[in-house]
């Protein structure tokens, strides 16, 4: 536990040893400033991530004792596993604001749950490269305005579907 003036951050060794860095337990950690420090685009893109990850971690622990999972539980575990993988970031390789927004927006709209967990990072990087090459104006708009309009959000989801179709054809 690390106490800070605007809340508390709970670190977990299990997360650390599984490759999550920083190993923050989002279900227990609390911050009063967190949202105020984010751009509007990031706030909109990451809307449900904290809750989704907390639910995933809870469900992951619960399902360790169960061998028979229904389809909804399997889908939620796949989604949570995808989010966990996407939040892992190599040392000294930060993503730009627009790359983070595109990643979170597509992930929270379940555009990557079809990808096997071990291939999620490659899929993410390939998708971001596709955005950069085919639709650079999307990244430019996010960087310039720091906003994620409904129209831009829809465009991102359309491009993500387009990339998925192209990736499946390869």
Regions found by a protein language model. Give the residues of each.
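Conserved catalytic/coupling modules of large nucleotide/cofactor-utilizing molecular machines
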Residues: 1-170
């Amino acid at each position: 536990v690390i106490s800070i003036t605007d809340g508390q951050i709970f670190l977990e060794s299990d997360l650390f040893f599984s490759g999550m860095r920083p190993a923050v337990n989002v279900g227990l950690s609390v911050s009063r400033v967190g949202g105020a420090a984010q751009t509007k685009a990031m706030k909109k893109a990451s809307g449900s991530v904290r809750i989704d990850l907390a639910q995933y971690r809870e469900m992951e622990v619960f399902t360790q004792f169960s061998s028979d999972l229904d389809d909804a539980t399997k889908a939620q575990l796949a989604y949570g596993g995808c989010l966990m993988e996407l939040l892992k970031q190599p040392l000294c390789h930060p993503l730009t604001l627009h790359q983070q927004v595109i990643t979170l927006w597509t992930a929270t709209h379940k555009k990557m749950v079809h990808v096997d967990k071990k291939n999620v990072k490659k899929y993410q990087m390939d998708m971001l490269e596709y955005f950069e090459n085919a639709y650079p104006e999307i990244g430019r708009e996010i960087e310039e305005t720091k906003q994620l309009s409904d129209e831009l959000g829809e465009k991102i989801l359309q491009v993500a579907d387009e990339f998925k179709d192209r990736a499946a054809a390869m």
